[in-house]
A protein has these predicted regions:
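Short beta-strand->loop
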Residues: 17-26, 33-35, 41, 54-68, ...
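Extracytoplasmic/periplasmic, Sec-exported soluble proteins
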Residues: 23, 41-44, 62-66, 85, ...
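A bilobed periplasmic-binding-protein/Venus flytrap-type ligand-binding module shared by bacterial periplasmic
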Residues: 32-37, 75-79, 159-171
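Hinge/lid segment of periplasmic solute-binding proteins
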Residues: 1-28, 41-53
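Ligand-binding pocket segment of bilobal, Venus flytrap-like solute-binding proteins
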Residues: 62-66, 70-74, 78, 82-150
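Extracytoplasmic/periplasmic substrate-recognition and gating elements
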Residues: 138-175
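Solvent-exposed loop/turn segments at secondary-structure junctions
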Residues: 28-29, 37-39, 59, 67-71, ...
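A short acidic, often aromatic-flanked loop/helix-cap motif at beta-alpha or helix-coil junctions
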Residues: 2-7, 69-70, 113, 155-158
Length: 175
């Protein structure tokens, strides 16, 4: 009764009867960008995944060091489902990422926080929860630039984290 029904409905995609999992948070994957650095580079704020292939951003792009999230960016850029099983679409996405690699400063996970707060990159692919932390930290540090978040118009990954108790857990009562 204390869990938003929308969470329970979302979790039915993998737990149809809501018997084995308890959802606790959800989020998106998007692009965090430094408004000051983009202004200095003469690059408009990103609105599409394709903006991460803009050569003016060479050395200023942080990509997720995650096969799923990196491929999601390339697949969505090309108008495909992030869950594509098509060999041709996956091959095209792979080539897109290979072509993008010279523009990428780093493939990171947690380091995107420090790099974006430190003004070390203009754009970064990031989870929405991390974005909230980064924006709060930027305000508390009194930074002279804004960090903004956008979900590209082609769409994104909407994710849901859930707790489960493994069948072979030793202390199920304590969970």
């Amino acid at each position: 009764d204390q869990i938003d029904p929308a969470y329970m409905e979302m979790s039915q995609a993998f737990d149809p009867e809501n018997k084995y999992s308890v959802p606790y948070c959800w989020g998106t994957v998007g692009i965090l960008y430094n408004t000051k650095l983009l202004d200095e580079l003469g690059v408009p704020a990103p609105t599409k995944w394709a903006d991460l292939w803009d050569e003016r951003l060479s050395g200023e792009i942080l990509m997720q060091d995650s096969v799923r999230d990196a491929f999601m960016v390339a697949l969505k850029k090309d108008g495909y489902s992030m869950n594509s099983e098509s060999k041709d679409e996956l091959e095209q996405a792979k080539q897109e990422l290979i072509d993008q690699k010279p523009l990428v400063q780093a493939y990171v996970i947690d380091q995107v926080r420090d790099k974006m707060i430190g003004g070390e990159a203009a754009v970064g692919v990031i989870y929405s929860g991390e974005m909230l932390y980064i924006q709060d930290e930027a305000v508390s540090l009194g930074l002279d630039y804004d960090l903004e978040y956008v979900i590209p118009e082609e769409g994104t990954n909407l994710w849901l984290d859930s707790w489960v108790i493994p069948k072979n857990a030793k202390n199920k009562e304590n969970a």
